[in-house]
């Protein structure tokens, strides 16, 4: 029997009842938890529990909501078949970047999107066989009898549930053949909703309501998120004592390294709140909480846009419609909708899945290897973090170990053993990505090429100049009947990388469009000059110093040093490990 994570999801029972501009406080310097009222003219733009955005209208099999079909009207090839025929599972590393770069990217992706219903437990397959009377949302992934890994085990299908759409939530809103739109239960903003939650209801259980602090539990001298009251269903525990955390995002427990980043920004919030309390003893809990949250988010935004994003989408602009210079636009525009794009969340931004590794290193302070753990052995069980020395060792390992190369491989553990636990077989992350894009009606690769102002392919021969190797066009032709069947999620990974970047032209177009909207459409973005929501000149100068290396140092006991560019590989010359005290730090004196 498959085991899946039962997560606590808050989905507004009346998500379609829009916030009104008249209910927004235009003079508040603080963003709401659910993202409403960021845009005062369109208060629901970017808010939690609203539909993902679109660059191109959905392409459904029935024109309304059924998964995308081939141009002929037939079903597209099995997502598992494509995973096996087109993608390898070789262990290829990207020596220029650390695993921290991949993991931080996953945190950002979670911050901007949480697909509604994606973690529900409604089995479509039982022991690898289709269930009788499946629920309507079932869309299992077929597995061929000659599958070289799962076929011998008699596996016929892999579990997959369709995303909840606006039509599911409110059928009356989808009359007259309106296309269904999938719901995002996270805010679309770069706002640390993964730490603070996407609603007051999610935030309340994780706040201390004293001194502006987030709730923590102290064990062995370190602060940890509170234990999840539903640990037996939220995590896969080996014993009732295993740590399972309650955070602003239920996916914090997915892996130890994801949990580390959640804990990092949780501890940073409390570190800031304590400093502000010392500077302003007259401030009450709410003021301290909101100011600490505001600073924490600003530091995070500085890191995302100026330290992390340039590592895979660097200047200069060598193609596509958006350059990074346009992403780093300093002025808010009320006419820009920041809503997370479906094609970004469920295709372009998933390119990072190639960089995930199946084994995670633990490192000593001198960066020699202390050991390693299996990703699948610790999926949904971050308990190892509280074992002696392991939190610091895994943090060092994450900032030292090379991430996987962005290529046509995906780690064996994620391709065959995802969520395996004690079962004889697991799921396939690449197949899930392909199936999810179909579920969401993402149009063809050719359609997105055209949208991005790039040449379309009229024949498979036209793919030759676009892809990694001349043989790749033939590989696509062997599984797709038409060039217009080729999927964005698949071909985007086959594209030649633009020199100096980690992506091809089509994914780059989508990613840059998304981050442009995310930045320019956020009224509270930390660079704004708006006197109501912006920072003073002296405060802003300090926020510019924020960097991931110093945050790791300040919030990781027993960590004594870090390279200044922690997303990049350690280099004895230009990026050597430095004492934590020598790394730039944000000084809160301007907040006096």
From Swiss-Prot:
Localization of this protein: Secreted
**What is the protein's major site of localization?**
secreted
Q: Which PROSITE patterns match?
A: PEROXIDASE_3
Tissues showing expression: Female salivary gland.
Residues in the signal sequence: 1-21
The biological process GO terms on file are:
response to oxidative stress; vasodilation
Q: Name the Enzyme Commission number(s) assigned to this protein.
A: 1.10.3.1, 1.11.1.-
Residues that bind heme b? 353
Q: Which Pfam families match?
A: An_peroxidase
Intrachain S-S bonds: 24-37, 235-244, 452-509, 553-580
Q: Which GO terms describe its molecular function?
A: heme binding; metal ion binding; peroxidase activity
Query: Which residue positions does UniProt flag as site: Transition state stabilizer?
Result: 251
Which residues, renumbered to this chain, are glycosylated? 25, 230, 366
This protein's UniProt keywords: Calcium, Disulfide bond, Glycoprotein, Heme, Iron, Metal-binding, Oxidoreductase, Peroxidase, Secreted, Signal, Vasoactive, Vasodilator
The family annotation for this protein states: Belongs to the peroxidase family. XPO subfamily.
Free-text function comment from the UniProt entry: Inhibits noradrenaline-induced smooth muscle contraction in the host, probably due to the oxidation of noradrenaline, resulting in vasodilation. Exhibits peroxidase activity.
Q: What name appears for this protein in its UniProt entry?
A: Salivary peroxidase/catechol oxidase
Q: Which organism is it from?
A: Anopheles albimanus (New world malaria mosquito)
